[in-house]
Amino acid sequence: MKKEDVPQDLKYYKGSVIRDLTYALDDKGHYEPVRSDGWEPKTEALDIFLETLDDQEERDKMELLVPTEFKGYELKINHRHAAHCENGTISSLLRFYGINLSEPMVFGLASGLFFAHLTFVKMNGMPVTAFRTIPGVLFKRITRLLGIKSASQRFLSKEKAMRKLDQLIMEERIPVGCVVGIYELPYYPPENRFRFNGHNICIIGKDEESGDYRVLDSNATEKVTITRDDLIKVRFAKGAYPLMGQMYWIKSIPEDLPVRMRTDKPDVEFLRPLVLKSIKDTCKNMTSQPKWFPYVGANGIQYLSRKMRTWEKKLGKRRARLYLVQVIRMLEEIGTGGAGFRFVYGAFLQEASERTGIAELNDYSLRITEIGDMWRDFGYKASKVFKRRAGESYTYDDLADMLEKISDAERSFFLDLLKAVERYIK
């Protein structure tokens, strides 16, 4: 996707600090983060999804609060806007320790790109379609890869959860990642809230007098503030997957790591094997799944294609429409940076090429960008199906045909990329 093609269909974000971010190519073929204020197929999918919920009256009473002022103690970490909350939070935690990794590098080094269509796992009563690894895995993978000691914890007691948070921020003076529900986040637009217990934020300070906390939310354009009561609500959000105050943090890092990970003078001998291992793992995750488990990787895309052809007949028109909406929301809405993280991964391959000197990786960056464009086209055509506009004749079979082509393209891409990186692995 080129910068000039980044959609700006502003709808839900008026008056809010929350904005979309994607990665797009400039005139010279270089990836840049670009702010995007929404995409029509994505917001249409969200509209249809929200119509199925029974909380419209409750959401209508919610107010949008944008508290950005703060007078308490705050760790010195600059705010960075990111496409995906978990990538952005991990990047913030690392940045505090002098490790300057971009969002794409965090995602790529953690082998975050994936695909799964899990008919046996339900969200809102419908199969889960995922374009990345399960939440929490990114932090575990990248800290293990870099030799960083980390910790995570859940709580039965709200008071114990808040005491532990205060101890880390105010006594140990370190930032903390928290997993929260977005439904009651006060700075999210009410009309854009739904019960999703998987948002990541970074807590970097506290005002002892008011009890407010300072927050880096990478989906926001600036730092925000949240009250103690609101933070407790979102940390202990109820639902199908209760959070239990889940939090994670870095305990210590190797002394020489910040120097080795410098962007101006990268330690190529240190970084290159990490990049190659991460890419190899991603390629295997996408192509080496057993035939008896067809739900994941490139095979999973083909599996979704087969299932999609049967939706209208087996589920009826209304249910089939909701299944399709669910796929598009996972593809575009849940902080993917567009096209199910494919643009983010393209940005990773390009940056990895520059930082390791492996020029070939840039060619693969452009190839997966083309695949990302195929996913974007699929999302656009899918919106024509679930909006059912007069005179438009796209069908579920048409969409399934597109998925088959995407499956073939991704399988070929990751097999070729695997062969390429194996030539560099000693």
Labelled PLM ranges:
Residues 95-104, 349-356:
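Short helix-capping/linker segments at secondary-structure and domain boundaries
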Residues 208-334:
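Noncatalytic regulatory segments and standalone regulatory/sensor domains
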Residues 324-426:
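Charged, long alpha-helical assembly modules
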Residues 17-36:
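Acidic, low-complexity, intrinsically disordered interaction modules
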Residues 60-101, 111-260:
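Conserved active-site-adjacent core of cysteine acyl-enzyme catalytic domains
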Residues 2, 7, 29, 35, ...:
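Intrinsically disordered, low-complexity coil/linker segments enriched for acidic/polar
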